[in-house]
Amino acid sequence: MPVIDETPMTYTEACRYFPGGVNSPIRACIPVGIVPPIVSSASRDVFIDSFGKNFIDFCGSWGSLIHGHSHPKILDALCSAASQGTSYGLTSENEISLATTLFSCLGLQDHKLRFVSSGTEAAMTSVRLACGVTQRSVMIKFLGCYHGHADVLLKGMTIDENNLMEVPHLVDRYFSSDPCLPLTLILPYNDLKTFEEVMEKIGERVACVIFEPIAINMGVVLPEAGWIESIITTCRRYGALSIMDEVVTGFRMGSRGMRSILDVTPDITVYGKILGGGMPVAAVLAHQSIMEHLMPVGTVFQAGTLSGNPIAMAAGQASIELCQERDFYPKLENLTEGFLSPIEDFIRCKGFPIALVRAGSMFSFFFRETPPRNLRDVQECDQKTFGIFYRHAFSRGVYLSPASMEASFISSVHSRENLAYTQNVLIDSLVKTFEGI
C-alpha cells in the first residue's frame, strides 16, 4: 500500500518550484510582510490553508468571486460541461449561450464580442484593435491604472517623472508610423486639464485612450465628476477610440456595469473576472463596425487555443445568471453598507488618519487623512502602518487583499456572522495599530 504524505504543503516548498513561491507576484504578500497562506480548499466566504486554519476571504480571487467560493450552481455547470469535453478548438454551443446572455444583460444591439482567457489578453487585444481601426499608433493610459502585463500597458504603474513625457518630445522623436507598435503616453489620473491639453496637441495621432472607470489597482480611487464622460467625448472629437476597462467593475457595479451607471458609451469595453465565475474568461466588446476589423473578417490578428473554452463558458453563464437574480445588487449593497459603515464611524470617532473608500462592494483602507485622487496621493499613504494593521487582522483569520494598493471585495455569500466578526477584528486591529494596546 502506498504511503500518503499528509504533511502540510508550505510556502517554503512552493519557493522550490515557483519564482517567489507564486505564479502571480502579489500573492507573495510582500507589501504586508506575511508568509502567504497555501490554500487547501474554499467554500462560500472562507478558505482553509494547508495547516487547517480558516480565513474569511475579502480578496475573492481579486474580485472574480462575487458569488463566493464553490457556488453550487457554478460547480454544477462546470461538472456538466466537463463531462462533454474539456476543449474543442471550435466554436461551441456554450460560447453562443454566454454571448446571448451577455448581450441581453447589457441591453446592447449591433455589437459583437471576442472571448479570450484573461484581462491582460482582452486589454492587449483592444489596443491592437484600436490601432488597426484608426491606423494610428499612440495610446494614452493613466498613471496607476492597471490593464494587464502586456508591454504597452504595463508602463505607468509607479511614479516615475521620466514616464510623464513632454508632448513636443513625444511628437518630434517618439511617434511611430507603424500601427502595430503603439507608443504609450502616460497621463495623471483625474487630471482633465492635462488630458485635454495633450489631446489638443496630438489628438489626431492618438489611436485609443484606455481607462478604468474606477481605478482599482492603486486601491479604490474614484473618478471625479465628469472625468470619464470627458475622456469619451474628447476621444470622439479627435477620432480616437475610447477603451473602458471593466475587467473588475463589470458585473461588480451592477448588471450593466459602469457604462450604465455613468450613462456613457465607450467605443470598446473590456470584461473579465466575474464574467468567468472563477474560470479564465475575459471579453472584448464593441459595435460590430469595430469588431469586424478582427480576423477572420478583418485584418487585425487575434487568436487563442483556449479562447471560449466550453467549461469556462459554462461557469461564466452560471455566474452571470446569478447576477441577474432579483435584488442581487441591492442585497449586496446593503450587506456591504452594513459591514463598512460601523467601521467608518469608528475611524471618524477616533480621529484615525484613514480614508475608507468604497465603491459598490469594493473597498480600500488608505492610511491618509483624505481619499486619494491619483497615484501620487496613494503613494503618500503610510504603507508601514497599513502593514501593521493588516498583520493584526490576518493573525485572527481575516484575509484582506494583501497590499494597500489593492481593493478588497464583499461577496454575495459573506455571512452576517463572519462580517460581524470581521468588524470587531478590524476595529480591534485599528486600536492596536494606533494606540499600541
From Swiss-Prot:
UniProt-recorded Gene Ontology molecular function terms: glutamate-1-semialdehyde 2,1-aminomutase activity; pyridoxal phosphate binding; transaminase activity
Predominant location: cytoplasm
Pathway membership: Porphyrin-containing compound metabolism; protoporphyrin-IX biosynthesis; 5-aminolevulinate from L-glutamyl-tRNA(Glu): step 2/2
Pfam families the UniProt entry points to: Aminotran_3 (PF00202)
Subcellular location field: Cytoplasm
Necessary cofactors: pyridoxal 5'-phosphate
Known EC number: 5.4.3.8
Catalysed transformations (reactions): (S)-4-amino-5-oxopentanoate = 5-aminolevulinate
Transmembrane segments: none
CDD domains: OAT_like
Enzyme class: isomerase
Keywords, ordered alphabetically: Cytoplasm, Isomerase, Porphyrin biosynthesis, Pyridoxal phosphate
Residues with the N6-(pyridoxal phosphate)lysine modification: K273
GO biological process: protoporphyrinogen IX biosynthetic process
Disulfide pairings: none
GO annotation, cellular component aspect: cytoplasm
Subunit-level organization: Homodimer.
Family stated for the protein in its record: Belongs to the class-III pyridoxal-phosphate-dependent aminotransferase family. HemL subfamily.
UniProt protein name: Glutamate-1-semialdehyde 2,1-aminomutase
Naturally occurring in which organism (per UniProt): Chlamydia caviae (strain ATCC VR-813 / DSM 19441 / 03DC25 / GPIC)
Gene name per UniProt: hemL
